């Protein structure tokens, strides 16, 4: 089965990437995972290139061949992709296009609480692991984590 998604996130995961987006047809979140148990389903960097050699970017609209649902209680958005096939570039979306398909979620809590972490006993009860939220009062602070190292914290 093929899904058309708008790429919304890409982050590092083991030696690969964690990639998620919005399903254009359903408006639901989709996280792309591989069948590689050593990387816990991370998508290899080479699997994020189109046939023409261009690399997938945020807000790209792509067609991806899905080989199955993952049935993961903690990350119910996970779908297994066929990594033997290139993802196919369809076009570029704007943030307005995304919000038309999937409006920002109005949540009092993210992942079931107001903290930057989730308790282990609560993780199976949340029912989602991805959310699109509108931030109205963002504050970025520089935090010292060692003698010569600083890090930003939101």
Specify the residue positions occupied by each region the protein language model found.
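N-terminal ordered "arm"
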Residues: 1-64
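Generic preference for hydrophobic/aromatic residues in regular secondary structure cores
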Residues: 5-8, 19, 31-34, 79-90, ...
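A structural detector for beta-sheet-dominated domains
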Residues: 65-67, 82, 141
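Short, Lys/Arg- and Gly-enriched loop/turn segments at beta-strand edges
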Residues: 69-81
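Short peripheral tails and domain-boundary helices/loops at the edges of structured domains
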Residues: 80-121
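Intrinsically disordered, low-complexity linker/tail regions enriched in polar/charged residues
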Residues: 114-140
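Residue-level detector of conserved catalytic or cofactor/ligand-binding positions
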Residues: 144-154
């Amino acid at each position: 089965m093929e899904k058309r998604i708008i790429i919304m996130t890409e982050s590092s995961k083991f030696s690969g990437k964690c990639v998620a987006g919005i399903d254009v047809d359903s408006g639901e979140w989709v996280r792309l995972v591989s069948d590689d148990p050593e990387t816990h389903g991370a998508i290899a960097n080479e699997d994020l290139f189109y046939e023409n050699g261009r690399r997938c970017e945020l807000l790209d609209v792509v067609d991806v061949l899905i080989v199955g649902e993952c049935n993961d209680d903690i990350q119910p958005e996970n779908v297994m992709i066929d990594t033997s096939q290139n993802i196919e570039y369809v076009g570029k979306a704007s943030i307005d296009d995304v919000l038309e398909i999937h409006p920002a979620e109005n949540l009092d809590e993210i992942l079931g609480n107001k903290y930057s972490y989730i308790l282990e006993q609560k993780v199976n009860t949340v029912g989602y692991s991805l959310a699109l939220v509108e931030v109205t009062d963002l504050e970025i602070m520089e935090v010292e984590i060692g003698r010569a190292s600083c890090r930003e914290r939101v």
